A protein has these predicted regions:
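C-terminal helix-and-tail extensions that cap enzymatic domains
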Residues: 29, 264-303
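Short, hydrophobic secondary-structure boundary micro-motifs
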Residues: 162, 260-262, 303
Length: 303
C-alpha cells in the first residue's frame, strides 16, 4: 500500500463483506498486516477460507497478530443479512469498522426471493440493512466507522424512485452491457446512503464514508456471460490493481485525517466531488424512507 501505515487499526475488529477477491481480498490482507482482526463475509466457504488464509499469511509476513474469521451469508437475501447481523452481534464484543464492500453487476434483470431486483438488493439494500442492524454494536464500540464501496459509475445516474425494480434501467443498456446503468444507480445509492447516514448518526461516535476504488481488474463480473466479459476486456488495459483499489478503503479505516469529513466520498486518499444525482433536493431522506420500506425496518429513527 502506498498510504502511510499508521497501525491505527491494530487490535480493531473489522467486518468486511465481499473479501474473497479483488479489492476486498486486498483490503483483508492489508488490514490483517496492520494487526486488525478481520471477519470475512462471503457466500462460498472454500473461497472464503482461501481468502482468510491469505490474510493470515499477510499478518504473519508483517510480524503481527491478527485473528481472521470466516462468516457465510448471501447478502442479496434479507434473511441472510439479518442472520449475519445476529451472528456478528453475538460473536464479537465490539465492532470498530464495518466495510460494506460486496457488490456485483448482473447482465440480466433478476429478482431475489424478497421480490427485489438483485443488484439493488446486494449493492444497496444489503449495506443499508446490515448497517442498521449493527448500529447498536457500532455505537457501543465508538469511535467506529462505516465504509461503503461506491464507484464513479454513479456519474450520470439518478436514484430511480419510479423504477426501483430496474425495468427501465435494464432496458437502457450501454456499450459495457445492459447491467451497467443499473449498477450506476446502485453505486449512487451508496453515496446518498453514506451522506444521509452520517447526518443521522452525527454525534454518536460513528463515522460514515464511501469511496471510488478506481477501475479495478477484479472477478466480480465473472458470471455475466460473453458480452459483459467482452465489455470489461476493452477497459481492462486501463485498470489498476486490486491492491491500489483497496488503498482508500484501508486508509478510511485507519486515518485520523478523515475525521470531520463524515459522509464524504473519496478517491485515492482525497475527497472527491459527488455526482450531481447525489445532491438532488431531498434525495437522502427519500432514499432512506423507501429503503426502510423495502427492508421492513426503521433505521436509526426518522432523522
Amino acid at each position: 500500500m502506498e498510504a502511510e501505515q499508521t497501525r491505527a487499526v491494530t487490535g480493531k475488529q473489522v467486518l468486511l463483506t465481499g473479501a474473497t477477491n479483488g479489492i476486498g481480498l486486498a483490503a483483508a490482507e492489508a488490514l490483517a498486516a496492520r494487526g486488525a482482526n478481520v471477519a470475512i463475509v462471503a457466500r462460498d466457504r472454500q473461497r472464503a477460507e482461501q481468502a482468510a488464509a491469505r490474510a493470515r499469511a499477510a499478518a504473519t509476513a508483517a510480524g503481527v497478530e491478527s485473528v481472521v474469521d470466516v462468516l457465510l451469508a448471501d447478502l442479496s437475501l434479507q434473511s441472510e443479512v439479518r442472520r449475519l447481523a445476529l451472528e456478528v452481534a453475538d460473536r464479537y464484543e465490539k465492532l470498530d469498522v464495518l466495510a460494506n464492500n460486496a457488490g456485483a453487476i448482473f447482465a440480466t434483470r433478476q429478482l431475489t426471493a424478497d421480490g427485489v431486483e438483485r443488484s439493488w438488493a446486494l449493492n444497496h439494500l444489503a449495506p443499508f440493512l446490515l448497517t442498521a442492524l449493527l448500529m447498536d454494536k457500532l455505537r457501543a464500540s465508538a469511535p467506529a466507522r462505516v465504509i461503503t464501496t461506491s464507484s464513479d459509475a454513479s456519474r450520470g445516474a439518478h436514484i430511480p424512485f419510479d423504477d426501483l425494480d430496474g425495468e427501465r434501467s435494464y432496458g437502457q443498456g450501454s456499450r459495457l452491457g445492459r447491467g451497467f446503468p443499473r449498477y450506476g444507480e446502485t453505486k449512487l445509492a451508496n453515496i446518498v446512503f453514506t451522506a444521509e447516514l452520517a447526518r443521522r448518526v452525527q454525534g454518536s461516535g460513528v463515522s460514515a464514508y464511501c469511496f471510488h476504488p478506481g477501475l479495478v481488474a477484479t472477478g466480480f463480473n465473472r458470471n455475466n456471460g460473453p458480452l459483459m466479459k467482452l465489455g470489461m476486456s476493452v477497459v481492462r488495459p486501463f485498470s489498476r490493481s486490486p491492491r491500489k483499489g483497496a488503498e482508500t478503503l484501508v486508509w478510511l479505516a485507519e486515518s485520523p485525517s478523515v475525521l470531520g469529513q463524515e459522509g464524504g466520498y473519496f478517491f485515492d486518499l482525497k475527497p472527491r466531488q459527488v455526482p450531481p444525482g447525489a445532491t438532488e433536493a431531498g434525495v437522502g431522506p427519500r432514499l432512506w424512507e423507501v429503503s426502510e420500506k423495502q427492508v421492513s425496518a426503521s433505521a436509526f429513527g426518522s432523522g
